A protein has these predicted regions:
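C-terminal and late-domain segments of enzyme folds
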Residues: 1-8, 14-35, 65, 113-115, ...
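Residue-level recognition of the N-termini of beta-strands and the immediately preceding loop/turn
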Residues: 10-11, 97
Length: 223
């Protein structure tokens, strides 16, 4: 929120396309803002079964921050393209609107990354918006899926471009197309730069995120 340049009264648009505009997700997000940040003006852009605002471009350009929900990145990007959202999002980005999101809401801005949108297995997704010229490996420390291994294998074989992986609780802050810093709400979590090594394998570099001071106690995120 601080990246908007405002301390209070930010105008935020929540975009839950990746979860099919789930009423449960919408209620959870709007309730969280109402409880924790009642000063924030929160709108919701739904696209099922038709857009919830008369002019998508005008509405999004009026926001300080666009927050994209996680879920199916394949469905998200397909629906966005049907409604002309990639062009609108680029216009917002170039106008200085902060673009944000987690999971699919992070992956969508990149070139691609592993996804379980097609089924239980992890498959390469290469149809991201590509605003950021990197791949993105989200949930890099998941125990129930081999996301770490899959992301690195896809980069090693050339299916995905070099990019950034993030363990849960880590965010990537870009300025333009340059990574400014990684931040985290989990002090032990890491981000990683991963690239092909030219010999059929990969090379990686650990990135130690800046811990967000107000959220540095891991106990806050248990349960």
């Amino acid at each position: 929120m601080g990246l908007t340049g405002k301390d209070r009264g930010q105008r935020v648009c929540y975009v839950p396309t990746a979860v099919g505009d789930s009423p449960v997700a919408i209620e959870a997000m709007t309730s969280t803002f109402a409880t924790q940040r009642p000063d924030v003006d929160v709108s919701v852009l739904c696209l099922f079964n038709q857009p919830s605002v008369p002019d998508i471009c005008e509405h999004l350009l009026s926001r300080d921050l666009i927050l994209v929900e996680g879920g199916s990145v394949v469905n998200l990007v397909a629906v966005w393209r049907a409604h002309g959202l990639p062009e609108v999002m680029r216009e917002c980005w170039e106008a200085g609107v902060v673009l944000a999101g987690a999971s699919a809401g992070s992956l969508c801005w990149h070139q691609g990354g592993p996804t379980d949108s097609f089924g239980d297995s992890l498959d390469p997704f290469t149809e991201g918006l590509g605003f950021l010229p990197f791949s993105n490996g989200v949930h890099d420390d998941f125990d129930d899926q081999p996301r770490r291994e899959t992301y690195r294998a896809l980069i090693a074989e050339g299916t995905l471009s070099a990019g950034y992986a993030t363990e849960d609780g880590v965010g990537l802050h870009y300025v333009g197309t340059r990574l400014h810093e990684a931040v985290t709400i989990r002090p032990a979590a890491r981000a990683w730069w991963v690239e092909a090594d030219g010999a059929g394998g990969y090379a990686e570099r650990s990135i130690v995120p800046r811990v967000l001071a107000a959220l540095a106690d891991d106990r806050t995120f248990q349960g």
